[in-house]
């Protein structure tokens, strides 16, 4: 499985733990909803800045966001 797919699954899991929609996460992280959708499907390779914004929105560390992803 690619890193992008693993990351997308992780973001989807963490988002669902908060019972947030993709739109909720997009608003909290100030990221386009379509971009969140692409990320969760493994179709994007996000920058560190985007990952940081997602982590802050989810109230977790970047390390927690990347936990369990093979290449990290």
Language-model regions, residue ranges each:
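A detector for short, charged/polar N-terminal pre-domain segments
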Residues: 1-6
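Short basic helix-loop element that most often maps to the first helix and adjoining turn
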Residues: 9-28
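Conserved hydrophobic/aromatic packing and binding residues within compact polymer-binding modules
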Residues: 11, 25-26, 36-39, 65
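Recognition helix of helix-turn-helix/homeodomain-like DNA-binding domains
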Residues: 31-44
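Short, conserved catalytic or interaction motifs in soluble domains
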Residues: 41, 60, 71
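DNA major-groove recognition helix of helix-turn-helix/homeodomain DNA-binding modules
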Residues: 49-64
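Short, charged recognition helix plus adjacent turn
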Residues: 64-72
């Amino acid at each position: 499985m690619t890193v992008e797919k693993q990351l997308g699954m992780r973001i989807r899991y963490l988002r669902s733990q908060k019972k947030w929609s993709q739109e909720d996460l997009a608003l909290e992280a100030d990221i386009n909803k379509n971009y969140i959708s692409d990320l969760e499907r493994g179709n994007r390779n996000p920058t560190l800045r985007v990952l940081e914004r997602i982590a802050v929105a989810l109230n977790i560390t970047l390390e927690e966001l990347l936990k369990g992803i093979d290449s990290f």
